[in-house]
């Protein structure tokens, strides 16, 4: 590399290292309304996909472990957002607690699926009623916390009930 090429490379490196307010705002989604809208759209698309998957299996599925997994994921995410918004004392939050108990029963005994199906469907209805009151970023925070719990490898449906009880006691 000759001297001129080296100087040119140094100029390019310095130019790229400079941070302007415009470059910072382009990288930071909190200043970009378009980026925020895209993130919100993606979060809601994933939540609705999880909700659709859970409801299909709840209505027609016979695989108890799959129902418990999908519904448990959705339930925890919504329960987290519910507590963030202070809705943990609503009838819907009580239904979420009951659904968590039903999922716990299903996880322990897959034969209990048919007897607990009504509680799962009630939980889906409660989730539908809660969703308009929940912010997308609260749902995302719940999903991130769920991911941390899953990485630890000890997620049970009792996490939902404990979290709601914790917030109700506070």
Predicted regions, residues:
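Solvent-exposed, conformationally flexible loop/turn segments
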Residues: 106-110
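Alpha-helix initiation/capping motif
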Residues: 2-6, 52, 60-67, 88, ...
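Short Lys/Arg-rich cationic patches that frequently serve as NLS/NoLS or arginine-rich RNA/DNA-binding motifs
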Residues: 1-27
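Short terminal alpha-helical segments
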Residues: 20-84, 167
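Amphipathic alpha-helical binding modules
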Residues: 111-170
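Extended intrinsically disordered, low-complexity coil regions enriched in Ser, Thr, Gly, Ala
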Residues: 69-98, 129-146, 150
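Short amphipathic alpha-helical segments that mediate assembly, nucleic-acid/protein binding
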Residues: 40, 49-52, 64-71, 93-96, ...
